[in-house]
Amino acid sequence: MVIPYVIEQTARGERVYDIYSRLLKDRIIFLGTPIDAQVANVVVAQLLFLDAQNPNQEIKLYINSPGGEVDAGLAIYDTMQFVRAPVSTIVIGMAASMAAVILAAGEKGRRYALPHAKVMIHQPWGGVRGTASDIAIQAQEILKAKKLLNEILAKHTGQPLEKVEKDTDRDYYLSAQEALEYGLIDQVVTREEA
């Protein structure tokens, strides 16, 4: 992946930043890849850094992700709930699967979608191999993750748990407006407010 750089002119001369470092300077985190342990560790570190810098100032988390590993996503989710700084979430493009959970977990009143963004929720999935005992253990873990993620979505959307369970049984796609009506976001925005 090519990472763009920006050159900033200051009174002391020029400063070169990779684009993600420059965005971080403005308290912006961009989650634009599938979520795995490595990606989660970077996002968690950025959240902790920005919270330590100023726990009263908003952190903006922009999301364009197909989702990914449940444990990695839960590390981001838990950190968002742990930090004192309010974390706003903005979906651009797509927030699917675990990324949809992260979107919904933003500070209430600060969860946004751009007009043509999509959100997709579903139950966790996984493939297993091994002995019958190992397969049984993995099946139990997936069922536990399914229950937990449905409870998290119900908590943040205000939807009844039974509805979330039904809706996540298969891939459930929502437009930005439908995500608003579902309670996954609080507003569809067309322009960033100053």
Swiss-Prot record:
The keyword Cytoplasm applies. The active site is at 97 (nucleophile), 122. The keyword Ribonucleoprotein does not apply. It comes from the Bacteria. Its main location: cytoplasm. Its EC number is 3.4.21.92. One of its GO terms (biological process) is protein quality control for misfolded or incompletely synthesized proteins. One of its GO terms (cellular component) is cytoplasm. It catalyses: Hydrolysis of proteins to small peptides in the presence of ATP and magnesium. alpha-casein is the usual test substrate. In the absence of ATP, only oligopeptides shorter than five residues are hydrolyzed (such as succinyl-Leu-Tyr-|-NHMec, and Leu-Tyr-Leu-|-Tyr-Trp, in which cleavage of the -Tyr-|-Leu- and -Tyr-|-Trp bonds also occurs). Pfam families: CLP_protease. One of its GO terms (molecular function) is serine-type endopeptidase activity. InterPro entries: ClpP, ClpP/crotonase-like_dom_sf, ClpP/TepA, ClpP_His_AS, ClpP_Ser_AS. Keywords: Cytoplasm, Hydrolase, Protease, Serine protease. Signal peptide: none annotated. Cleaves peptides in various proteins in a process that requires ATP hydrolysis. Has a chymotrypsin-like activity. Plays a major role in the degradation of misfolded proteins. Belongs to the peptidase S14 family. PANTHER family: ATP-DEPENDENT CLP PROTEASE PROTEOLYTIC SUBUNIT. Fourteen ClpP subunits assemble into 2 heptameric rings which stack back to back to give a disk-like structure with a central cavity, resembling the structure of eukaryotic proteasomes. This is ATP-dependent Clp protease proteolytic subunit.
